[in-house]
Amino acid sequence: MVEFRAYQEEARYFKYAFNAAGKVVEEAPLIVTENGIVSRAMDASHIAMAVLEMPWEMFDEYEPPSDELMYGLDMEEVTRIVRRARVTDEITLEGEDEEEVIIKLGSSGYEREFRLRSIDIDDIPDEPELDFAVEVTVVPDFIQDAVRDADLVSDTVKVGAKGNTFYFKAEGERGRVIPKVQEGAEALLTFEVEEDVETAYPLDYLKDMIQAAQGAESVRIRLGQDMPLELTFRIGPAGEGKLTFYLAPRVEE
């Protein structure tokens, strides 16, 4: 018996969001309620956390369950499936008796159905509540380019704000890179800074997280001195959903 059904005519939003989350966390719950679908999970090393929120408004059709349901997902398997989505594909998520999640991809009468057995999830973390000194919103291209540029010279990147400038900074034996954007630039959609900040983060995680930028409308970045970095990718036709990552700072000796 189908317990819930969620349909969206553009599978690409889910393709990039699930692909990015699946690179960061190995297992994740899928919590389904009358308000939509939510997932929260930590990576095995507890360095990063992924929070996916898909409210019912994000879907073209949403048939909620009569009671809250939870499925456990092997994110590697989910990633393998959503990568198969074509540009023109629609996507449908369905669940049966908290035992199976069904993912349907296709268009124009051609459909592929994938079934995933639900796995046991031991712990569902709470989303942290943090007070950040810096909050900016950028176009997705900026953070993609900044992370890829930093990766040319180092495995660590410093993210910061000083005056009216928001920047990434990476240094290594191969050189130095400083992608930056100033208040008023088209790439910087919002800019709120209480104090100057600069904190270092591991690039390998950021390279995985920015995969979500391909399907995002915008990216909110929040940070504080020696605090976790928060990245929020707005997803969906009108940015109704969001994928948020938290990344612990890199302690420098």
Curated annotation (Swiss-Prot):
InterPro entries hit by this protein: DNA_clamp_sf (IPR046938), Pr_cel_nuc_antig (IPR000730), Pr_cel_nuc_antig_C (IPR022649), Pr_cel_nuc_antig_CS (IPR022659), Pr_cel_nuc_antig_N (IPR022648)
Gene3D superfamilies: 3.70.10.10
A Pfam family reported for this protein in Swiss-Prot or TrEMBL: PCNA_N
The keyword DNA-binding is annotated on this UniProt entry: yes
The entry's keywords: DNA replication, DNA-binding
UniProt GO MF annotations: DNA binding; DNA polymerase processivity factor activity
Domain of life: Archaea
Protein's GO biological process: leading strand elongation; regulation of DNA replication
PROSITE patterns (UniProt xref): PCNA_1
Keyword Lipoprotein among record annotations: no
Family to which the UniProt record says this protein belongs: Belongs to the PCNA family.
The protein's role, per its UniProt record: Sliding clamp subunit that acts as a moving platform for DNA processing. Responsible for tethering the catalytic subunit of DNA polymerase and other proteins to DNA during high-speed replication.
Subunit field text: Homotrimer. The subunits circularize to form a toroid; DNA passes through its center. Replication factor C (RFC) is required to load the toroid on the DNA.
The protein's name in its UniProt record: DNA polymerase sliding clamp
Taxonomic lineage of the native organism: Archaea, Methanobacteriati, Methanobacteriota, Methanomada group, Methanopyri
Gene that produces this protein: pcn
